[in-house]
Amino acid sequence: MAVTLPAGPRTPWTPPRGDGSALRASRAPGRAGRTVLTLALASWFLLPLAPLGLWLFADRWSYPAAMPDVWGFDGVRSALAQGAVPAFARSLGLGLAVSAVATPLGALAARALAYHRVPFPAAVNAVLFAPLALPAFAAAFGLNVLLLRLQVAPLAGVILILSAYALPYTTYTMRVAYGAHDRGFEDEARTLGATRWQVLTRVQVPLLAPALARSAFLAFLVGWSDYLITLLVGGGAFTTVPLLVASAASGTGNDSVVAVLSATAVLPPLIMLLGLGFFARKPPGDLS
């Protein structure tokens, strides 16, 4: 026998109200800690650059003076006279060329290692990461003879060797990205009739864009900051910013010139790193 209870007035449930002060108070120490950590890291990075910034505009700085004795732009003029602008353009072009070669190769290798059964994976990983264990001098000295016998242009040889040295960084970065990549988006796009090219350009590349940007940045750093391979394989005919810095630092009385060239070498990667950090921020509706 069923018992029917009389229906009473329905009172809608309302969540408890609060001013949120307890929640904000619990988050305050975390924000303060992050702020302190950010300031500490910024100070740790920027404080060593303070003397460099002073030397940029110091014509003479004698010991034990705490500040430069004479301010001026002699260092800038000397750096320009030594070919800082062409060297900057060559370094930029070299970094971009290495990035353009090593990034797609690293992405292809990472996708194969992540999604396909590769025979002898340990041996393949050893070959991919061998440039990190091989001394740069030995590699450049040995490969330089081979490139000369094959009549490979010095610039092309520099790009090839530096791309091989950048390949472990791009492969590892993209392998981590492919490991976290959801292939269901690609399958859904194919179900909806997308071609292989459309899946690549409209689904896979946008989802992996932050990882591709990180890989390209690491490969750019390899080409931008290289000294030994560019010197040995390039034969001294391809002068870049690191070569100019080393040449100026080997002399005496060139502190202001070294400061200008060092700033030229440091600022572009720093600007790219800041841009990479801004680019890597995902919008609220990002599915990746």
Regions found by a protein language model. Give the residues of each.
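Transmembrane-helix boundary motif in ABC transporter permease subunits
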Residues: 22-26, 96-128, 141, 145, ...
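Interhelical loop and adjacent transmembrane-helix boundary motif
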Residues: 8-12, 26-31, 61-64, 73-83, ...
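Membrane-helix interface segments
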Residues: 84, 115-124, 152-156, 196, ...
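C-terminal transmembrane helix and the adjacent membrane-cytosol boundary/short C-terminal tail
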Residues: 2-24, 28-36, 47, 58, ...
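Generic hydrophobic transmembrane alpha-helix motif, especially the helices
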Residues: 124-158, 165, 169, 213-214
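Hydrophobic alpha-helical transmembrane segments of multipass integral membrane proteins
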Residues: 85, 89, 93-105, 109, ...
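Membrane-cytosol interface at the C-terminal ends of specific transmembrane alpha-helices
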Residues: 153-191, 198-204, 211-216
